[in-house]
């Protein structure tokens, strides 16, 4: 393909983490070749990077069968919008970021339209629904994975695959000390700080924030001097938290800025499962991982999931770095008990922090955005 010719790339990131990774990729590609333009599904970070978002990822970020059914109309409309573009005005490349239920269907449309498909960040099919690898082999031209053990999985299935490294290895770099970070948020460095991380999806917040807040109340009863911080994800608004925070008497600082500095300011964190657990681990802050699904979704998942851990920091480390409390175990009492131990048991805390160092060791070096940009340029040039 001639150098300098405008090159259009459709990119689909249906969740907050994908918005972060997509933004880094867009910047890296445009730095290498300004002739590239991006459009598709994303959030504020991708828009800031220069991507035209036809659909906001905040409207797509749901988990579980019941939750998807509730948002079916929005998701279906987004799919039809992108399908129409793929068939009537096909781009030079389609980049899919995780979000497999939606993205694999879109990949099928791209194949019909003759558009090459680059899949960035593998669905966790090694954990469940391994049969999906056959569909991926049919629909995806190249798989770019971020965890080393994913490479042999795809190689054995005959899927072209590259290990590009985990983008978080570059994104999570904090130079501040705990006290410096705490001071920057106006917090009292002499008092312990607990992070309350309810997730980036509205459905997660409504399902888990009440439990997290009740755990915080129990902690405050035992440790009256505690301070709490709560990050507001880019996919959420103040209104999404209002039903639970209005009238809440806990000393909670809500912020949208400098998430990694906020993690460093914390002495311990209550976090939902997801990419955020990896970020917290890379910062080096002890945490407890919680998750709840609707009863129907959980029963289905229990039959299908084939891995020991749900927390990404534990999956990457290959061991139980952070305790996981799932469904009924994710009670305010158990959550408060684990955080209380992290705050009061110095020996337990030290051993925990030592395990956290294993996570960064397993991720290896950075450079994921640069490697991904190289793949994008190569695939477009060959198309």
UniProtKB/Swiss-Prot annotation:
Pathway: Bacterial outer membrane biogenesis; LPS lipid A biosynthesis. Keywords: Glycosyltransferase, Lipid A biosynthesis, Lipid biosynthesis, Lipid metabolism, Transferase. The gene is lpxB. This is Lipid-A-disaccharide synthase. SUPFAM superfamilies: UDP-Glycosyltransferase/glycogen phosphorylase. InterPro entries: Glyco_trans_19. Gene3D superfamilies: Glycogen Phosphorylase B. Belongs to the LpxB family. GO terms for biological process: lipid A biosynthetic process.
